[in-house]
Amino acid sequence: VATLIRFCHNHGLTQITDRPQWYTVRGGSRQYVRRMLAALQHDGRHEARLNTPVLGLRRVEHGVLLQMAHGTEQFDAVVLACHSDQALRLLGSDATPQERSVLGAIRYQPNQAVLHTDASVLPRRQAAWAAWNYERAADAGGNQAGVCLHYLLNRLQPLPWQQPVMVSLNPVRPIDDSQVHARIEYSHPVFDLAAIEAQSQVVTLQGQHRTWFCGAWCG
């Protein structure tokens, strides 16, 4: 319950009046990457390698060995900016018991996001349209069969179109295929009691064996 209340509070969902003002970055989140790359290139002391997947890693006395498709290279330290289960796979047999305990405690669930223009998923009354629209499905017996969030992007982004553009997370009813522009599969952490306890232990891992962790799963 505390996790849900914290999430709602952080997103301004616990207040009726004085709603938060949404802001967006012009050009989208890719601007973060462009600014970081520009800073690294301007610095002259760092090198950014794109499209270079890391297959595994191993900590040694004076650094960290990263295994890539073209071979293995040694670095001073490593920051694992990924899901905890992905970090655990990269560490492999090199993971410590504490890392296995903390990283392995967090479960993930698959989620599908659908980008579309099928406005039938929104409330019948246009006056009720919001940035976030909640929909609950029930089975024949009236029991809850699924929950979906429809994000109305026109309320969140300065889109140049009048037509409603939505992102539906885990749709509970069919969306008109002719109005679907993209389907994206995600994996999100499940913040249950085990995950919350693991989050409190992440700090004990940071910097150990020249390894750092970050990501939404850290809390």
What name fits each language-model region?
Residues 1-58:
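Active-site/ligand-binding neighborhood in enzyme catalytic cores
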Residues 12, 27, 170-172, 214-218:
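Short, loop-centered acidic/histidine patches that primarily coordinate divalent metals
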Residues 48-50, 80, 213:
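A structural signal for the hydrophobic beta-strands that form the central parallel beta-sheet
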Residues 52-189:
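Mid-domain catalytic core of redox enzymes
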Residues 174-219:
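C-terminal catalytic lobe of FAD-dependent flavoproteins
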